[in-house]
Structure formats: structure tokens, C-alpha cells
Design a protein with these regions (language model features):
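Anionic N-terminal interaction surfaces
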Residues: 1-60
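Acidic, Ser/Thr- and proline-rich intrinsically disordered linker/docking segments
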Residues: 3-6, 10-11, 20, 76-141
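Intrinsic disorder/low-complexity signal
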Residues: 16, 36, 40-44, 50, ...
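A structural detector for beta-sheet-dominated domains
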Residues: 26, 34-36, 49, 60-63, ...
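Short acidic, gly/pro-rich beta-turn/loop elements at beta-sheet edges
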Residues: 33, 41-43, 70, 110, ...
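Phosphoinositide-binding peripheral membrane targeting modules
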Residues: 49-97
């Protein structure tokens, strides 16, 4: 599956860039996120408070078991397991953003803070997430 974000002509990620991006994927990136408006009810259970997603700036990490958005729920991390992701696609909600659709109908959008080769890095992250998701589906099917 290919994604064309129409990157600048002739600008490519070098081997050094790819190594740096791979390292940053694990460490985490500061990103503008649109996440479901989760909150806690009186019993302490997680509930969706409204249908609209809220915009926030968080650290996004992509680990072996899923995507983590740090402190998305007060002090708790939001973890999106590979098995819960139904589709990854580019979006116009946030400039150079990626939309992660889940099987339960919710979605998360994020765009990393980086002005240097942003479209190529977003393309790399898109491919990385898709590979992880597909490998996870193949492993459990």
C-alpha cells in the first residue's frame, strides 16, 4: 500500500535520516494530536465524554505492541494495540497528519513536530505503522 503525500521533488530521506527517524519512533515525538475526549466517571472507569476529538500536544511513541500517546488521559497513557487498528490514512484535519482508525469506530490523528523533510518522515511513519499492523494481523491469523 503506497501513500503519496506529494513530497517535494528530489528530496529524499538519506540513510542517516532513516536511522534517526527509526530511533525517534521508539523514543517518542512531540506531536499535535486529535484524540477522543476520554474522561473518568464517578467509579473511575474510562468513558467517552463527547463525540468530538480534542486537540492536544503529546508525546507519541511507536513500540512493538502498539502506539502510545503519553498522558492522554490525565496521567495515563493511551495505548492503541496493533490489533485494534483498522486503517491508517493521511488526513487534512491536521497538516501532514496521519489518521489511525480503530475497529470500535474511534480514531486518533497526529502530526509530528518537525519541519525538516516532514512529508518524507510522515511517509516513513505511515509505512512503518502499516508494516507493523500487517505483520501483527498475519501473526495472529
Amino acid at each position: 500500500m503506497a501513500l503519496n503525500l506529494s513530497p517535494e521533488q528530489g528530496v529524499k530521506l538519506t540513510k542517516k535520516d532513516r536511522v534517526h527517524v527509526a530511533k525517534k519512533i521508539k523514543q517518542g515525538w512531540k506531536a499535535t494530536c486529535l484524540i477522543p475526549d476520554y474522561g473518568f466517571d464517578e467509579n473511575g472507569d474510562i468513558q467517552v465524554m463527547s463525540d468530538r476529538n480534542r486537540r492536544t500536544v503529546k508525546i507519541v511513541k511507536i513500540k512493538d505492541d502498539g502506539i502510545y500517546i503519553e498522558k492522554a488521559l490525565k496521567s495515563k497513557n493511551l495505548r492503541i494495540l496493533w490489533g485494534k487498528i483498522s486503517l491508517v490514512s493521511p488526513t487534512k484535519e491536521i497538516k501532514d497528519g496521519l489518521k489511525i482508525d480503530m475497529y470500535d469506530g474511534k480514531y486518533v490523528v497526529f502530526s509530528i513536530y518537525n519541519s525538516y523533510k516532514i512529508q518524507q518522515i510522515t511517509q516513513y511513519i505511515f509505512n512503518y505503522i502499516n508494516d507493523k499492523r500487517t505483520n501483527n494481523e498475519a501473526m495472529y491469523s
